[in-house]
């Protein structure tokens, strides 16, 4: 039922930590966690007799809370050195707080397993990963074979043509200085026309060579669109409202699910599933839960 609620929220990233403890006749082990927003699970793997254990009956017991919030004791393993020195539990998961004790025997008994912590994924890191993927995709398109070398060649040839035209204009101006003032005024008019005709000549030369400057425009548009994407980061989703949470819980109950009946477990459930930290809203949800 909790898994169905988590589908609407941000994904949980599990973190695994090694766990181990030693039990003796007068030495119990208490497993507790701080009251944080993360969900903790104790997954027990193996129970085995330690070196120096006597060939006698050893009974390992675990004490935790059941679904109703009441304490319950469960026998995990029964060991004897000459018959069964070790038992594999295969991932026996318990929600803390948990007390592990040696109910019978002198020990030592070793218990190993994993401490599982469910941590919420950071929404900002996901957005950064998506932007990195888009950046790689755009850079791959720009570096297509045979496509990126055409524009620089066109620019080089156009620059050479402009330099040739500038040299011709300078030669014409030098010739005009040597002539009379009347001829100077007459010669300036065609020089200006030649300068004005330069773009047309360049366009004709580029058209004769079968080349055009238009392919350079999509690249600038792609850069502008990428800059717009960097300026508008996505905002992470906030916690759900009280009415939305009630609606989701009611829908879960109608589908056959159930809600925790103990206040402490219900509060922990609301914090983990809906990221709700407002104490007044949590109490409102608890009063609504008791009225069902």
Curated annotation (Swiss-Prot):
Region (Necessary for interaction with APEX1) residue spans: 1-117
Tissues and organs where the protein is expressed, per its UniProt entry: Expressed in B-cells that have been induced to switch to various Ig isotypes.
Segments of this protein annotated with the region Disordered: 138-248
One protein family per Pfam: Nucleoplasmin
Organism: Mus musculus (Mouse)
Span(s) of short sequence motif Nuclear localization signal: 152-157, 190-196
Modified positions (Phosphothreonine) in chain numbering: 75, 95, 198, 217, 232, 235, 277
Localization of this protein: Nucleus, Nucleolus; Nucleus, Nucleoplasm; Cytoplasm, Cytoskeleton, Microtubule organizing center, Centrosome
GO biological process: cell volume homeostasis; cellular senescence; centrosome cycle; DNA repair; macrophage differentiation; negative regulation of apoptotic process; negative regulation of cell population proliferation; negative regulation of centrosome duplication
Family listed: Belongs to the nucleoplasmin family.
InterPro entries membership: NPM1_C, Nucleoplasmin, Nucleoplasmin_core_dom, Nucleoplasmin_core_dom_sf
Chain residue ranges for the region called Required for interaction with SENP3: 1-185
Function per UniProt: Involved in diverse cellular processes such as ribosome biogenesis, centrosome duplication, protein chaperoning, histone assembly, cell proliferation, and regulation of tumor suppressors p53/TP53 and ARF. Binds ribosome presumably to drive ribosome nuclear export. Associated with nucleolar ribonucleoprotein structures and bind single-stranded nucleic acids. Acts as a chaperonin for the core histones H3, H2B and H4. Stimulates APEX1 endonuclease activity on apurinic/apyrimidinic (AP) double-stranded DNA but inhibits APEX1 endonuclease activity on AP single-stranded RNA.
Site (Interaction between pentamers) residue list: 55, 80
Modification type N-acetylmethionine: residues: 1
Swiss-Prot/TrEMBL keywords: Acetylation, ADP-ribosylation, Chaperone, Cytoplasm, Cytoskeleton, Disulfide bond, DNA-binding, Isopeptide bond, Nucleus, Phosphoprotein, RNA-binding, Ubl conjugation
GO molecular function terms listed in the Swiss-Prot or TrEMBL record: core promoter sequence-specific DNA binding; histone binding; identical protein binding; NF-kappaB binding; protein homodimerization activity; protein kinase binding; protein kinase inhibitor activity; ribosomal large subunit binding
Residues with the N6-acetyllysine modification: 32, 150, 154, 211, 227-228, 248, 255, 265, 271, 290
Modified sites of kind Phosphotyrosine: 67
GO cellular component term, pick one: cytoplasm
Protein known as: Nucleophosmin
